[in-house]
Amino acid sequence: LHLSIRRQRQMCIRDRDTALSFILIIGSITALFMGFLGIIQNDIKRVVAYSTLSQLGYMTVALGASAYSVAVFHLMTHAFFKALLFLAAGSVIIGMHHDQDIRNMGGLRKYMPITWITSLLGSLALIGTPLFSGFYSKDSIIEAVHATHLFGSGFANFAVLAGVFVTAFYSFRMYFLVFHGEERFGKEHAHHDDHAHAKAAHADHGHDDHAHDAHDDHGHDEHHGLAPGQKPHESPWVVTLPLVLLAIPSVLIGFFAIQPMLHGDFFNGVITVNESHGAMAELKEHFHGAVAMAIHGLSTAPFWLALAGVVTAYYCYMINPRVPAWFYKHFHALHTLLENKYYMDKFNEVFIAGGARLLGGGLSKVGDKTLIDGLIVNGSAKVVAWFSRVIRVFQSGYIYHYAFVMILGMLGLLSYFVIFPLFAK
């Protein structure tokens, strides 16, 4: 991202709309489809990690829309609330005795109040709640995409809006399963059986329909977790104090930084945008202050999509867990696709790594063994050996053999001095 922004001058000078469209489309695909992967994760750290990939997609979208300062702005705000969420996930893992599976949690709010409230603030910032830092940066990206007219901008606009719903859904899916609902820790869990879990989802309101992967890496050893009767605990102050400190900018930094970073002179002389790409000019024209933007945000599609994502997550995992079980049953193929990360790992293993191994094997067989060892190394030795055998015939000790060699040498010299000048003319 940083290198792309550093190269924005070349993109502007040469007016590479094709390159910008490519960046816009790649970013929007990343923002949406990495968010889908976050929905099915059960490892608390993986949910936050795929969220990070999705948000990097939003930043890339901003680059494609020539809103470079917005990309940096979202990078900055995202650094605070994502660091908060990662540290909160670590706090939960500590409190759960290194269990990272959100299906084994639930009801942690009363045991870990500081982690609970800071996680809520970080999640609200992530989904773009008005007045929170993520709102100002993410909404600016969405508006910049709406203002651009590059090829692929229609798809990008759809993807970033759909991504708002997806982000809210997986963020609060994790939040509700970890901090609310029935306490599921300190019990024996059988997450390895798909059908057993699908049945359990009908009876247990806290369980998740996606917890049925025999090969899912839950991120913890089978001996980790709370023993029966053991309760979670809040993390020590060396963890909770940074949580509180990170929560403050996660809420406030966007409010105070949007004016200088996007509409002030913060990037003067550093970022130059081609006049034909007017996304930033349109953002500046419609900006009337951070408070006005937050109030206006309550009536925009991103806010209602985020709210819909939160409500949907609450309904599916707190009120009626039969809904996720139904989706798993009827859309098992889709779940398998997401579970296997769109088979990109398999693609990389077969085509990228396999192709590299095939190329390396070919170079080893043809280049190294045949050309280098066979022709140059061993071949040169064989030529010297053959030449030695030929020369050895004339080194017999008989004078007529030496005389014959001298005659051949003289004929060679005469041929050189007589024939070569003819060709030289």
Predicted regions and their residues:
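Single conserved hydrophobic/aromatic residue that forms the stacking wall/gate
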Residues: 1-9, 13
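Internal transmembrane alpha-helices of multipass membrane proteins
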Residues: 7, 18-67, 121
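Hydrophobic alpha-helical transmembrane segments of multi-pass membrane proteins
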Residues: 19-29, 76-80, 158-166, 248, ...
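Divalent metal-coordination and catalytic microenvironments
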Residues: 43, 53, 78, 105, ...
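Interfacial and helix-entry/exit segments of alpha-helical transmembrane bundles
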Residues: 49-54, 59, 96-132, 155-163, ...
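Interfacial segments of multi-pass membrane proteins
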Residues: 59-63, 139-157
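Predominantly late transmembrane helices and immediately cytosolic-facing juxtamembrane segments
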Residues: 82, 86, 157-228, 305-309, ...
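Aromatic-capped, Gly/Pro-kinked transmembrane alpha-helices
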Residues: 233, 237, 248, 259-304, ...
